[in-house]
Amino acid sequence: MLKDYMQITKELCRITSEKNLAQYLRLSSFKGSREGIGRLKKEGIKGFLCAETMERESYYLDEASKQKLYSDGKYNDRKLGVKFLPTWLKMEKEESIEEKLDYLIVKKFPIVVFTHEWAIMDDEQKIWSNFEKVFERVNRMERKIRFF
């Protein structure tokens, strides 16, 4: 995993510059051992995006950690020095995005938005419509938005 990450990162830096690299990752199927996550942390990764529901596995997190993740909107593994954030808004699954946005805003949770490439190809209009709703709502908000 680390070798692949370093190779991809090297090429991305060559093409786009180091400042454009993501500091939060979403690993395939949310798989990553504590050891592997620690190695990525040493490469500059600050955190990881988790599954949209507590029922799904997310990396090495146990039930107590997942409970904190979903009740607080984030989980910080202080020992390892990495953060975990739920992927609250999965564009291809959202039917009522406004309701979920209201919930996140009231709770003051980070707004994490995600979609798969295949979903854009399957229903481009729905995906972009959902993204527009999120961006419009965020632009209307008066609180400061932090980008990772």
Residue positions per predicted region:
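Helix N-cap and loop-to-helix transition residues
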Residues: M1, S33, F147-F148
